[in-house]
């Protein structure tokens, strides 16, 4: 077998020839050591990599130039290449300027001017619209406002397309379909209610689609059968009107909807990329897209803003409510919402009339338009109105906590209505979000089926838009009212009542100090940055808080279960938990046997009816009902309310009290914002609970292990403190002081005044600058500082390497900062006076040397960059004119320099 000893190419498995010699360009050995240059180049083009995928060694090529190439390029060649590069740059600059002008100037400006023209309400504005388009008055403000208008129209367009997809794939409501509902596998109509009523209480929570937003708390069980009966009655009425032609039209319509995204649409989407659509590929096709975007903006402004606004405006004027709407400071928004409400009523009336006269295509079009308006209004109510109500109710119930009155809130609303409403909406959204998060935590602890009246947000079938499409409007209205009652009652229980108790028991504890000014000697900026950079990351980035809360909920549930004999109801039985896997398998098999796959005409309604026809609700576990079960449930609710009240009292008093006591050592008797005291108290409480939980976890391991762990943790804490002093103390202080000397002092302090430096402010700003520099470094290219920071992050606190951090990170950074601070000072204070200059010149040099040296460093960096760019241009010109090929460089093991030979010039690599 002589061929086994011959050198062959790793790709084509051929031997080397004088015309095609073999090379060994990387560290690989054995049968994959050698390769032809042509094979390697072909493989590199295919893989789009410049290194060996096995040994990670970068391949090197040496350029081959023409024999008549001079040692130095002639001036005329360099000048010609420079002119060509400048011409290419100018052409690209003109093109990208045109692109930016079109998308950032023409599109938003036309949108804003058309919007103002339509809402001016005069014919003269419509006639002068072409001249207004060319006007340069308020150009920047109109562009910014136009960007907002364009964003709204694009969001509306995307929402319409997405809503259409929801209707196509999820199925339209039953009342919108033309034909009679198809039969399911059991032989019943799709809209018939199930015969069995067992477990209706638990099934109803999983019954139709999940509630539309996070505020619908109360389930819809009592009216499930009524709703199905109403839908059945509607469908039976529609059956009398629909014929064979209608069924064919419905099937064809559904088929047309499914064929809307055909292959040609996919092919067109593949050809249209973002670069081509925006004009970043160098073509002028984007001008057509600009025209279509402007037309789309005009159409959407006219249809979705102009028409509803004027419908609402004429209606309010006719009813005499115009003055009340104007007094709300949100005339445009309220008028538009009223217009949409009237439009929805008009559409549903026209839909009914079209049904009576059997205009089936018009009937379907009117129904789809009604669904669009209905979903839009429900989204506004769920995401806008409900959090706003919660935010205002929270504010009203907490007025005594801040020593405020309703008159103060009215004055703040009159002075800044938009800001006030946004802040209250934001507070309400936070409240709703944390309430939903707490419900998710409860589901992890309690028995499946306990919270049957609450939505399961983790349900994979959860789709609020489908609920908005399918459920009638009165059910959404009822859910909204019940949710407002439930959320409002919780606010009364956990905020208003604890405040009343605190004021009666601790009269001097309230109100909280929330003034925007402070007479404390410590800078507000320092406290804010300390809060944002130290306290909040520790409280938010740790997963221990959720585990502690989950443990408290589990302990409370176990206690309440044994006290009230509701352990089986709350947590389930152990025997049932052991057999839960078998039950789940049986339930899944039962579900597969009963659930019919919905066809095109059925959609989501059939899926919901399939869920209803199961033997029990999804995820339900049976439980044992003790005697006097309703009374025990009532006592459980009372016990829960008392627990929530006590927990709220502790949360409102303990952190603030601890924070005030600790901050008094720092600020004395001066009053500061309660945000800082509460944050400080929460941080101390968190540290205390964390230490207690760690000690409790160590207790079962014995005294020797505890001493060993205490020793390890003490050593780790000492190392961490040293690193914190260097990296979180010295480095930010030097960085903030350097920023003060280079930027702040020359800009803010005149030459005839002496700048004052505040170490706390400099340190706080330095912390912010250090985090920004670290983030930019980690996002940038690979260099020694990024490598060191990544290594420190990878080690973490438990494996902290003090020697590595001091030697590789702290010492170099501190040395550079000290040199940046000391060298200019030595020059200004030690060298300049020896030159015999005047005192004014010495003061000028002393105050301006830091920004001057910064400018020198920046100019040197720019000059170095330009030199590198000129070298690249020189190589590019030389390669374009004299390069005839490239030769692969062999890897030499014995020579480190050859083994790590640098890659060829970028312009010559292929």
Swiss-Prot record:
Residues the entry annotates as binding Zn(2+) 1: 9, 12, 36, 39
Compartments, record wording: Endoplasmic reticulum membrane
PROSITE patterns, per the entry: ZF_RING_CH (PS51292)
Transcription regulation found in the keyword field: no
Effect upon mutating residue 9 to A: Abolished auto-ubiquitination. Loss of ubiquitin ligase activity
Effect of residue 888 to A: Does not restore the degradation of PLIN2 in MARCHF6-knockout cells
Effect of residue 885 to A: Does not restore the degradation of PLIN2 in MARCHF6-knockout cells
A single Gene Ontology CC term: endoplasmic reticulum membrane
Top-level lineage group: Eukaryota
TM spans (from-to): 92-112, 143-163, 284-304, 337-357, 377-397, 422-442, 481-501, 520-540, 633-653, 679-699, 722-742, 765-785, 816-836, 849-869
Biased segments, Acidic residues type: 223-248
Name this protein carries in UniProt: E3 ubiquitin-protein ligase MARCHF6
Organism: Homo sapiens (Human)
């Amino acid at each position: 077998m002589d061929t086994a000893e011959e050198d062959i190419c790793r790709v084509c498995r051929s031997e080397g020839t004088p015309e095609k010699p073999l090379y060994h360009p990387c560290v690989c050995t054995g049968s994959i050591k050698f390769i032809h240059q042509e094979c390697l180049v072909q493989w590199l083009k295919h893989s789009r990599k410049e290194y060996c995928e096995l040994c990670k060694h970068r391949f090197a090529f040496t350029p081959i130039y023409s024999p008549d190439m001079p040692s130095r390029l002639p001036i005329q060649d360099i000048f010609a290449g420079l002119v060509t590069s400048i011409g290419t740059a100018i052409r690209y600059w003109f093109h990208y300027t045109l692109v930016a002008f079109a998308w950032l100037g023409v599109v938003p400006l036309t949108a804003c001017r058309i919007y103002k023209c339509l809402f001016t309400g005069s014919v003269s504005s419509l006639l002068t619209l072409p001249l207004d388009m060319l006007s340069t008055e308020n150009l920047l403000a109109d562009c910014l406002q136009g960007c907002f208008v364009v964003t709204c129209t694009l969001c509306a367009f995307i929402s319409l397309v997405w809503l259409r997809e929801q209707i196509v794939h999820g199925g339209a409501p039953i009342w919108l379909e033309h034909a009679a509902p198809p039969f399911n596998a059991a032989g019943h109509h799709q809209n018939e209610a199930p015969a069995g009523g067992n477990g209706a209480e638990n099934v109803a929570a999983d019954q139709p689609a999940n509630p539309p937003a996070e505020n619908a708390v109360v389930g819809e069980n009592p009216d499930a059968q009524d709703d199905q009966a109403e839908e059945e009655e509607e469908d039976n009425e529609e059956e009398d009107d629909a014929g064979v032609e209608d069924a064919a039209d419905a099937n064809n319509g559904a088929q047309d909807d499914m064929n809307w995204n055909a292959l040609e649409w996919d092919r067109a989407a593949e050809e249209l990329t973002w670069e081509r659509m925006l004009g970043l590929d160098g073509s002028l096709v984007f001008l057509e897209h600009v025209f279509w975007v402007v037309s789309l903006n005009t159409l959407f402004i006219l249809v979705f803003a102009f028409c509803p606004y004027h419908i609402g405006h004429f209606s309010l004027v006719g009813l005499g409510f115009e003055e009340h709407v104007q007094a709300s400071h949100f005339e445009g928004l309220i008028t538009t919402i009223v217009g949409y409400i009237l439009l929805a009523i008009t559409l549903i009336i026209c839909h009914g009339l079209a049904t009576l006269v059997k205009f089936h295509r018009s009937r379907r079009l009117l129904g789809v338009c009604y669904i669009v308006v209905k979903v839009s209004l429900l989204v506004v109510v769920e995401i806008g109105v409900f959090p706003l109500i919660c935010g205002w109710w929270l504010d009203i119930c907490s007025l005594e906590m801040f020593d405020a009155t309703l008159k103060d809130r009215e004055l703040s609303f009159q002075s800044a209505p938009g800001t006030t409403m946004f802040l209250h909406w934001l507070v309400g959204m936070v409240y709703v979000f944390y309430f939903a998060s707490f419900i998710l935590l409860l589901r992890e602890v309690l028995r499946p089926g306990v919270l049957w009246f609450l939505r399961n947000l983790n349900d994979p079938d959860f789709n609020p838009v489908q609920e908005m499409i399918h459920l009638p409007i009165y059910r959404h209205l009822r859910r909204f009212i019940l949710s407002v009652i439930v959320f409002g009652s919780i606010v009364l229980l956990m905020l208003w009542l604890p405040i009343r108790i605190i004021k009666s028991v601790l009269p001097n504890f309230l109100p909280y100090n929330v003034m925007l000014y402070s007479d404390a000697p410590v800078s507000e900026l320092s406290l804010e940055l300390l809060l944002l950079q130290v306290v909040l990351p520790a409280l938010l980035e740790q997963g221990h808080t959720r585990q502690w809360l989950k443990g408290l909920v589990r302990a409370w549930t176990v206690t309440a279960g044994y006290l009230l004999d509701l352990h089986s109801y709350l947590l389930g039985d152990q025997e049932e938990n052991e057999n839960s896997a078998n039950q789940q398998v049986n339930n899944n098999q039962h579900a597969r046997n009963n659930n019919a796959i919905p066809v095109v005409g059925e959609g989501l309604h059939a899926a919901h009816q399939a869920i209803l026809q199961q033997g029990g609700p999804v995820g339900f576990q049976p439980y044992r009902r003790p005697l006097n079960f309703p009374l025990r449930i009532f006592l459980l609710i009372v016990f829960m309310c008392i627990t929530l009240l006590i927990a709220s009292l502790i949360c409102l008093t303990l952190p603030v009290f601890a924070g005030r006591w600790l901050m008094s050592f720092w600020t004395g008797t001066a009053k500061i914002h309660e945000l800082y005291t509460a944050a400080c108290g929460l941080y101390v409480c968190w540290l205390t609970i964390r230490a207690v939980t760690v000690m409790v976890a160590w207790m079962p391991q014995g005294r020797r292990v505890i001493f060993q762990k205490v020793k390890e943790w003490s050593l780790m804490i000492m190392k961490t403190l040293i690193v914190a002093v260097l990296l979180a103390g010295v480095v930010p202080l030097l960085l903030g002081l350097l920023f003060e000397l280079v930027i702040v002092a020359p800009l803010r302090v005149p030459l005839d005044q002496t700048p004052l430096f505040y170490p706390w402010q400099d340190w706080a700003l330095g912390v912010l600058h250090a985090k920004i520099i670290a983030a930019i470094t980690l996002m940038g290219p690979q260099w020694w500082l990024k490598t060191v920071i990544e290594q420190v992050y990878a080690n973490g606190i438990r494996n902290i390497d003090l020697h590595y951090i001091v030697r590789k990170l702290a010492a170099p950074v501190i040395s550079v900062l000290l040199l940046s601070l000391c060298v200019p000072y030595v020059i200004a204070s030690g060298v300049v006076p020896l030159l015999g200059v005047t005192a004014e010149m010495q003061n000028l040099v002393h105050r301006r040397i830091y920004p001057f040296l910064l400018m020198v460093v920046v100019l040197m960096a720019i000059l170095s960059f330009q030199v590198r760019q000129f070298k690249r241009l020189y190589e590019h010109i030389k390669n374009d004119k004299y390069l005839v090929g490239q030769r692969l460089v062999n890897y030499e093991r014995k020579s480190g320099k050859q083994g790590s030979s640098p890659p060829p010039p970028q312009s010559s690599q292929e």
